[in-house]
């Protein structure tokens, strides 16, 4: 058996999340079917991913691995599998890796970017690709509140009731808020994320930005470890899985591909 790592992007608005579902249109099901068609067997090939995205969440760079008996050049994987995929999913690169590589467990960190449009009316050209807030936001207060979340914490106040993670402790190493014209760009990096963690953090930051809660509320919410005390879960529309960090020994290509796709906002 050969293990192949694949880097891909997708428009999450077309799909009911990454993970396979019995009666759902998911990225995983569609990719595995395309891999089966490319292999010539017609039977879906099982994949494992770096991070399972929810319904409506996009990926500028997702990484998966697949075990196969096929012997093909990297470019054949890219062009061949893309030929069986819809336009909302695209393979960017492929690389043969050793059995010691695992798309999920070998990853050292994941980075998400959230694009938020600030404007009086919703942006039609950014429908499903950016979140929207029409109220004025105190960006300074939001940045101050974000500092309370950096480091290793129990993020129970920011996990969904459906979260299947074995424990709620995560290490958040980055939470930046940049202003890019009418957009606010939120960049979050952690060793891993809980279900709805980024969207629940976004909800809390917006409560503070709108003056509904104080800057200190973020720290008290974190200490409470109670999701019922948090803000509503924010829209998935502007959320992008943008980068996966792996040890250099795996020599994976174009791991900054997601950052490149979002470069007008993150540069």
Curated annotation (Swiss-Prot):
Which Pfam families has this protein been placed in?
PseudoU_synth_1
Query: By what name is this protein known?
Result: tRNA pseudouridine synthase A
Any one GO MF annotation of this record: tRNA pseudouridine(38-40) synthase activity
Q: Does the keyword Nucleotide-binding apply?
A: no
Q: Which family does it belong to?
A: Belongs to the tRNA pseudouridine synthase TruA family.
Give the enzyme's main class according to its UniProt record, as a single word: isomerase
Q: Name one GO biological process term.
A: tRNA pseudouridine synthesis
| Subunit | Homodimer.
Q: Which residues bind substrate?
A: 112
The taxonomy runs: Bacteria, Pseudomonadati, Pseudomonadota, Betaproteobacteria, Burkholderiales
Reaction catalysed by this chain?
A: uridine(38/39/40) in tRNA = pseudouridine(38/39/40) in tRNA
Residues of the active site are 54 (nucleophile)
Cross-referenced NCBIfam families: hisT_truA (TIGR00071)
User: What HAMAP family does the annotation carry?
Assistant: TruA (MF_00171)
PANTHER family listed in its UniProt record: PSEUDOURIDYLATE SYNTHASE (PTHR11142), TRNA PSEUDOURIDINE SYNTHASE-LIKE 1 (PTHR11142:SF0)
Note the InterPro entries from the entry: PsdUridine_synth_cat_dom_sf, PsdUridine_synth_TruA, PsdUridine_synth_TruA_a/b_dom, PsdUridine_synth_TruA_C, TruA/RsuA/RluB/E/F_N
What does the UniProt record say this protein does?
Formation of pseudouridine at positions 38, 39 and 40 in the anticodon stem and loop of transfer RNAs.
Cite the entry's keywords alphabetically: Isomerase, tRNA processing
Q: What is its EC number?
A: 5.4.99.12
Presence of keyword ATP-binding: no
